[in-house]
Amino acid sequence: MTNIRKTHPLMKIVNSSFIDLPAPSNISSWWNFGSLLGICLITQILTGLFLAMHYTSDTVTAFSSVTHICRDVNYGWLIRYLHANGASMFFICLFLHVGRGLYYGSYMYLETWNIGVLLLFAVMATAFMGYVLPWGQMSFWGATVITNLLSAIPYIGTNLVEWIWGGFSVDKATLTRFFAFHFILPFIVAALAGVHLLFLHETGSNNPSGLNSDTDKIPFHPYYTIKDILGALIMISMLSSLVLFSPDMLGDPDNYTPANPLNTPPHIKPEWYFLFAYAILRSIPNKLGGVLALVLSILILMIIPLLHTAKQRSMMFRPMSQCLFWILVADLLTLTWIGGQPVEYPFVVIGQLASVIYFLIILFIMPITSMIENQLLKW
């Protein structure tokens, strides 16, 4: 008799995705981040749901309701900090996941890659709107500054900004709609993640060598289920340590001051995971130019498959490309640091240099280096 997991309509889907899925035998721990992102998303949805039970999206009571959650709700402080630091964990996993894709040439699976970039945009939008909800100083001014960027769009800009605000400034209407969007977007992210997996399972996973692995496949369960569980335990222990020992390490002290439209904080900056893009935005003196650079800094991921000139898929056997990849990582870390610094010399110049290097490496240096490597390997 055939096993129920292979015949039952619902079990069949689970079976072909997580149990009998043929996986390459040599995928390393860099392939763990997909499952870790799934765990992050589930954690965020659950903690967010419990927070939403006690939160009020009104300018008068929003800040107080978050304080109430931390002080009066059973384990409210734990739920709130799990949610806030869970977002940081989410982005750490996201950046590592994208970095893995770039290093090993996983972007050659076009549909999977492009949906992944859409997912990145959706998660960034969700995180931005979530940061506005506690209605602290940085929430209010962050929302004001970032939404105001849309006014750089010619002709319709100002109308668009006021339409998003629901008035002539960031106020009650803005907070209410941001809460609504922040609630719905994670479910859209979950649906997109399902499509992401669907397309991935059409082709099967890539592997570190970048070579076809059809001749050497192993079942996902038990080999990679146990490996994913280990990864999950490590991530959960890291998140728990962060939440229980230094929950405010990644936050901004300004956000413990209630929002005040009459008092601008000295340094307006987003959460750490947006600082690299914020630094690129600030490095261009023109408003529209800065906004375009900001959007392109992420959108550029979509054209990476078109810039692949190497005859090999992975960077595993391409030392020159490897060096460039790590220079790009260092450049992004530099941008992240600059994004958190005040707008003054020498930070402005460093930011401009790092921004130029970021686009140069991706658009020109990487493809040219790959072509040189082809010549050196006589391919």
Curated annotation (Swiss-Prot):
Xref: InterPro entries: Cyt_b/b6_C, Cyt_b/b6_C_sf, Cyt_b/b6_N, Cytb/b6-like_sf, Cytochrome_b, Cytochrome_b_C_euk/bac, Cytochrome_b_N_euk/bac, Di-haem_cyt_TM
Keyword Iron: yes
PROSITE patterns, per database record: CYTB_CTER, CYTB_NTER
Record's cofactor remark: Binds 2 heme b groups non-covalently.
Listed result of changing residue 60 to M: In strain: Isolate A-0V-2-A and Isolate A-0V-3-A
Binding, a ubiquinone: 201
UniProt record similarity statement: Belongs to the cytochrome b family.
PANTHER family hit by this protein: CYTOCHROME B
Membrane topology: Multi-pass membrane protein
Any one GO cellular component localisation term in the record: mitochondrial inner membrane
Transmembrane residue ranges: 33-53, 77-98, 113-133, 178-198, 226-246, 288-308, 320-340, 347-367
Stated consequence of mutating residue 109 to H: In strain: Isolate A-0V-2-A
One term of GO molecular function: ubiquinol-cytochrome-c reductase activity
Annotated protein name in UniProt: Cytochrome b
GO biological process: mitochondrial electron transport, ubiquinol to cytochrome c
Chain residues that bind heme b b566: 97, 196
Named cofactor requirement(s): heme b
Remaining remarks: Heme 1 (or BL or b562) is low-potential and absorbs at about 562 nm, and heme 2 (or BH or b566) is high-potential and absorbs at about 566 nm.
Subunit structure: The cytochrome bc1 complex contains 11 subunits: 3 respiratory subunits (MT-CYB, CYC1 and UQCRFS1), 2 core proteins (UQCRC1 and UQCRC2) and 6 low-molecular weight proteins (UQCRH/QCR6, UQCRB/QCR7, UQCRQ/QCR8, UQCR10/QCR9, UQCR11/QCR10 and a cleavage product of UQCRFS1). This cytochrome bc1 complex then forms a dimer.
Pfam families, sorted: Cytochrom_B_C, Cytochrome_B
Role, per record: Component of the ubiquinol-cytochrome c reductase complex (complex III or cytochrome b-c1 complex) that is part of the mitochondrial respiratory chain. The b-c1 complex mediates electron transfer from ubiquinol to cytochrome c. Contributes to the generation of a proton gradient across the mitochondrial membrane that is then used for ATP synthesis.
Alphabetical keyword list: Electron transport, Heme, Iron, Membrane, Metal-binding, Mitochondrion, Mitochondrion inner membrane, Respiratory chain, Transmembrane, Transmembrane helix, Transport, Ubiquinone
